[in-house]
């Protein structure tokens, strides 16, 4: 499988002199849904901001679909990497939902017909097509986050980065977000999710990158990383609750690497059937 993102010996120091990333090496395959996890200050967002050239390496190299991100402007990288910020207020400025979502395609030089088509498709994906004339700040926090995502999807990037996309979402919003991630994977997009919610990561992501103090300390399948509490503890991260339960019940034959409630339910049902 081809690489969507390649990070080689990446080190970054902020102008203050604080070192935020330390010799990070990482390959992300095309079409994967990958979570960046770790406690606050671990370097997750700093790393992700190198993907679209919001930050330039102090040393090392980041390539996205073969493009050296440090040699392109953020506006040039917008065709390749869409970045959805954690706080929608940092991203929204249009007076209507349609104006907000149409800005990106229009800025990329698309004509009026193509711009409208891209905007409507993106709004349909996130469930906001009925709100095209609504002012963004008349919407709920969760809807505004979905609007930011639509604004990014309208530019049809190859890679989508989402910073805490599940924060502020109700049950319906979380279900919709899961459906969107599945759809992005189905059409070949690479998605990078920054999250502190391990239950969400377990359900929606297939690979996990664990960071601590600017270093990458583990990269592997979601099951492999989330079912290893000692490794997660290095960055003050706890496994999903159901995984902690599975580990506690492992002496009774429950697999310790269960990471979702659905897996636990299936395991217990099968165990009950066998004991009858």
Predicted regions and their residues:
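Helix-to-loop junction immediately C-terminal to a conserved catalytic motif
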Residues: 52
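Conserved ABC ATPase "signature" region
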Residues: 113-131
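Conserved ABC ATPase signature
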Residues: 135-139
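Catalytic Walker B motif of ABC-type/P-loop ATPase nucleotide-binding domains
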Residues: 160-163
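Conserved ABC ATPase "signature" C-loop
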Residues: 213-214
């Amino acid at each position: 499988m081809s690489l969507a993102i390649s990070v080689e010996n990446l080190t970054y120091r902020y102008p203050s002199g604080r070192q935020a990333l330390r010799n990070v090496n990482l390959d992300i395959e095309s079409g994967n849904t990958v979570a960046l996890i770790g406690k606050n200050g671990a370097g997750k967002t700093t790393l992700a901001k190198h993907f679209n050239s919001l930050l330039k390496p102090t040393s090392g190299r980041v390539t996205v679909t073969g493009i050296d991100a440090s040699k392109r402007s953020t506006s040039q990288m917008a065709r390749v990497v869409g970045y959805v910020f954690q706080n929608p207020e940092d991203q929204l400025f249009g007076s209507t939902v349609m104006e907000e979502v149409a800005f990106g395609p229009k800025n990329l030089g698309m004509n009026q017909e193509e711009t409208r088509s891209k905007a409507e498709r993106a709004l349909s994906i996130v469930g906001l097509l009925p709100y095209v004339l609504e002012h963004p700040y008349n919407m709920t926090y969760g809807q505004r986050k979905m609007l930011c995502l639509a604004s990014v999807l309208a530019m049809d990037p190859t890679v989508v980065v989402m910073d805490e996309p599940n924060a502020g979402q109700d049950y319906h919003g979380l279900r919709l977000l899961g459906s969107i991630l599945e759809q992005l994977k189905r059409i070949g997009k690479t998605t990078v999710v920054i999250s502190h919610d391990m239950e969400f990561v377990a359900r929606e992501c297939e690979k996990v990158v664990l960071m601590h103090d600017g270093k990458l300390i583990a990269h592997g399948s979601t099951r492999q990383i989330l079912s290893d509490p000692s490794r997660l503890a290095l960055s003050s991260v706890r496994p999903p609750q159901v995984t902690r339960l599975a580990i506690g019940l492992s002496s009774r034959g429950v697999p310790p690497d269960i990471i979702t409630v659905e897996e636990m339910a299936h395991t217990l049902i099968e165990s009950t059937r066998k004991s009858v």
